[in-house]
Amino acid sequence: MRCPSLARLPHRAVSGLTRTPVRFQSQAFLTARCASTAALRSATPVHQSVLNRRYQQTRNASGTAAAVLEAAAQTPDSLSQEAIIENLDPVEAERLSRVRNIGIAAHIDSGKTTCTERVLFYTGRIKAIHEVRGRDSVGAKMDSMDLEREKGITIQSAATFCDWVKKDEDGKEQKYHMNLIDTPGHIDFTIEVERALRVLDGAVMILCAVSGVQSQTITVDRQMRRYNVPRISFVNKMDRMGANPFKSVDQINTKLKLPAAAVQVPIGAEDEFEGVVDLVRMKAIYNQGSNGENIVVKDEIPEKVRELAEERRRMLIETLADVDDDMAEIFLNEEEPTEKQIKDAIRRATIGLKFTPVFMGSALANKSVQPMLDGVIDYLPNPSEVQNTALDKKRNEAQVKLVPYNALPLVCLAFKLEESSFGQLTYIRVYQGTLRKGSYVFNARTDKKVRIPRIVRMHSNEMEDVSEIGAGEICAVFGVECASGDSFTDGQLGYTMSSMFVPEPVISLSIKPKHSKDYANFSKAMARFQREDPTFRVSFDPESEQTLISGMGELHLDIYVERMRREYRVDCETGPPQVAYRETISQRVEFDHLLKKQSGGPGDYARVVGWLEPTGKLEENQFEEQIVGGSISEKFIFACEKGFHLSCEKGPLIGHKVLGTKMVINDGATHMTDSSEMAFKNATQQAFRKAFQEGNPAVLEPMMKTVVTAPAEFQGDVIGLLNKRGATINDSEVGVDEFTVYADCSLNGMFGFSSHLRAATQGKGEYTMEFSHYEKAPPQEQRELVKKYLQAQADRHKK
């Protein structure tokens, strides 16, 4: 038998695992496993007639949960999501069916925060609507930083909890709980989007009705695919001049390569935008009231859009027939699908990552946001319908499934940290078990035991204290010292969540407070920002005696410098941007190095023999020992390995990290009294420096995947700008009124590009960059970098 709402569930493995076919398994499978579970064995047979019915049911339920947990750990591939759902406690199944963990993501300035503001208003989360650039601390809850309100961009992901009351077809009202996360659109804050998608079960992708799919929309799409997050689409700004929602639908199909079809058509557009026609129910929907809070549904579709609505409904059914077997059968039999059949097909295809339904409206004009919320309930999965995995540290990090049962041992993830007036606020997603106030949990990374003093949910203008949070929900806790991405358990399981994808920083700045009295606050700010943001790094360069901050781009670091000034009242001086270069060798070099210092008393003696060679890929460095006969003891080998890794932290060429280099030690010699771990560490470092210089060394520079979008008339100017910077153009797309160029550019060549692009395109061009890979810098640039480094070293020695 096929369950229409669960036919194609996403097999979501957060570490990018491949999807496997969904299999149904009966209760009998788990009953048999349950019977063999040691915890449930009994010396005497248990008879229903003897025991209290309720006690027996509770015992059976806990036994089934234990059996499911065992199957999830031992044979995760054979345990289907349907079997997990089938064996859910009925009360738990009802609770989870009413939960949605969703995010809102899109290109910058597509109206994410404006849309979220309406969602909060219509769900009763806030009492009045306030715009993105406003100064009201209530209305601008999702942009709570002054910096966000001034710049009109979202920097951090803001999380909130709200209730949405949806009317069923029979008119009965049902309350659903939504955990909603608003995310940044700017590429420099991409870690915020990664963190949000990591813990969400579904997303709303917002597009501009005028611009359609833009460069950052493509990045967000790639992130959603990485975490297998199903999404519905919302074409916003239908009241703007030049609004064309069907261009967005076409671009989702062509640019994002994702089948899409409109589930609504607009009644009017631009200044005359009145409402939408629901293509599933074939009814007209209008918003009334000063803030569009009243929904009016009419059976009569306006004559001016009737033909368009019928045509688009046919296209919706045809698209669904391409991605859903049941709808294909109905379509081939030339039958007219019912409203329920269309809804079920949309839900199956959306959750199966094969389709996205496209809604349309205008958040700023307070029109058609509520039908989009109904779409979240109808078409996005609840927590029990999504597969999540963890790693079992006790079994060599074997992959296990997480089961959203409250009765099972706790597994949860801290995905975001914030400072508040009450202390550190930690956002947590519970995947399995129950998180209770006052309970103790174990940090899987540090193995430290931590007490949970307070649990809150963001609700109705304030934090709502709760005593416990069940599986599948998101909450915030106070008083827990941890880092972003830490996993927590109750100690019964040795599970850790596979970590989020965290890109390496590509740009650095030297930074110091202008006034020495500010060093205490400066240190506090640095420590806090590092805990909150894994892509923000702080280091100290002992040679230049400078503190360096590293991040994803100029804006990323500028925001933190500005936050330090506003939140900690620390004015800072920053140096010019520094590129994160790397060093490597190009050929194999053998070495035989002797360190010998014997001038009376304890001396140093160490001889190391081996070779350096490139690994073939510009990835991690490798150390290997191939010693036969014990010429170097094991403790000295460890010292050699330590010396190698220390050498890789600061290369001989320009003082940057070494990449893609392998050291092999296959012989050596020791002295009975003068050999020590320190001597072998130093000998390895000296051998490394000498051999590295002989191995045809090279400087590597970071290459950035760059996407430039501008009006079509500026295509020649933009191509010229990229060519001047030595970019490699990989692809280009020319639309009706704009074009997009995809190129690989060196980060060093892209400094100042934004101002030149604005000048060349009359302020209409935009671009995004993200790290792609390392490759050798041009010879002239390498020579200049080496010369500059040697000069700096000489100047330092003179002092």
From Swiss-Prot:
Pathway: Protein biosynthesis; polypeptide chain elongation. Gene3D superfamilies: 3.30.230.10, 3.30.70.240, Elongation Factor G (Translational Gtpase), domain 3, P-loop containing nucleotide triphosphate hydrolases, Translation factors. Residues 1-24 form a transit peptide. PANTHER family: ELONGATION FACTOR G, MITOCHONDRIAL. The gene is mef1. Its main location: mitochondrion. One of its GO terms (molecular function) is translation elongation factor activity. GO terms for biological process: mitochondrial translational elongation. One of its GO terms (cellular component) is mitochondrion. It comes from Emericella nidulans (strain FGSC A4 / ATCC 38163 / CBS 112.46 / NRRL 194 / M139). It is found in: Mitochondrion. This is Elongation factor G, mitochondrial. NCBIfam families: EF-G, PRK12740.1-5, small_GTP.
